[in-house]
Amino acid sequence: MNIEEFDYDLPESLIAQTPLKDRDHSRLLVMDRETGEMKHLHFKDIIEYFRPGDTLVLNDTRVMPARLFGLKEETGAKVEMLMLTQIEGNDWEVLLKPAKRIKVGNKLNFGNGKIIAECIKEMDQGGRIMRLHYEGILQERLDELGEMPLPPYIKERLDDPDRYQTVYAKESGSAAAPTAGLHFTDELLIEIKNKGVNIAFVTLHVGLGTFRPVSVDDVNDHEMHSEYYQMTQETADLLNDTKSKGHRIISVGTTSTRTLETIRRDHDKFVETSGWTNIFIYPGFDFKAIDGQITNFHLPKSTLVMLVSAFSSRENVLNAYKTAVNLEYRFFSFGDAMLII
């Protein structure tokens, strides 16, 4: 299967640069998973597609203000560091810009010494493992010194950083938002609960792979990045009960999907667990966890387009994307949404 099979034409003007004033006023393309039949609504209308007994699964990760600007201690050269994934203790996987002159042993200074980052391992494509030295609590230092790490295709400054967080964001650790969740408001979630729909949470911290394109021609040769996930006993019990009663599990975003499918693959049921997943979902994948998913419109030739294609079909998804382009839907992180069910 060639990467070019997941390409599509997208005018740059359709890449949403700012969020809408009201989260749930974005447009919603509802697509039948089997037939590809489409309907066009607004996100607040999504409640029409939920049934009592369904469980909606949200990723409660919180985006860190993880973009830092500092100086190389030895030379005073300016450097930008994007913190991606906590490896262990104070060791973090990061992206540096520029990176080529940052070698093992070099130190970076942020905020006049409030954070010192020492390079302990070089990786490819600008990646490094850095050991952080700081006083107090890291989250407080990041809140003081860091900026929100918006995706590279967003060129405009975000006036309100909370608009790149879901309203239910809780567990800090992501380098990017689980953007399908950005459409939900507190009020909409209450309406959904009042309809008899369960709300469950998992955590998956979005990391390095979000910022890197697929670099191989043959999809089978792609190595997926690893991301940390966790599921509580409460969520596991609720999901197992949903399945046993014949109700549906609907995931919000590809991150929730990857978490749920990882756990069902590894344990044959939902269990309290945590770990790292590099699950790669592309056409031919056998879904065992979800019955529907909510997702944004993703970048051409990305693993996320492959994931949604696996859940329906490549033909259905690319036809839906072509329709969305023709109808001038908004694309990517601050864009509109799909419900595939």
From Swiss-Prot:
Annotated organism of origin: Staphylococcus aureus (strain NCTC 8325 / PS 47)
Annotated protein name in UniProt: S-adenosylmethionine:tRNA ribosyltransferase-isomerase
UniProt keyword list: Cytoplasm, Queuosine biosynthesis, S-adenosyl-L-methionine, Transferase
CC terms in the record's Gene Ontology section: cytoplasm
Recorded catalytic activity of this chain's protein: 7-aminomethyl-7-carbaguanosine(34) in tRNA + S-adenosyl-L-methionine = epoxyqueuosine(34) in tRNA + adenine + L-methionine + 2 H(+)
Location within or outside the cell: Cytoplasm
Record-level Gene Ontology MF annotations: S-adenosylmethionine:tRNA ribosyltransferase-isomerase activity
Subunit: Monomer.
InterPro entries, A to Z: QueA (IPR003699), QueA_dom1 (IPR042118), QueA_dom2 (IPR042119), QueA_sf (IPR036100)
One Pfam family this sequence matches: Queuosine_synth
GO terms (BP aspect): queuosine biosynthetic process; tRNA wobble guanine modification
Family annotation (PANTHER family): S-ADENOSYLMETHIONINE:TRNA RIBOSYLTRANSFERASE-ISOMERASE
Family: Belongs to the QueA family.
Role of this protein: Transfers and isomerizes the ribose moiety from AdoMet to the 7-aminomethyl group of 7-deazaguanine (preQ1-tRNA) to give epoxyqueuosine (oQ-tRNA).
Disulfide bonds: none
Pathway linked to the protein: tRNA modification; tRNA-queuosine biosynthesis
Residues annotated as signal peptide: none
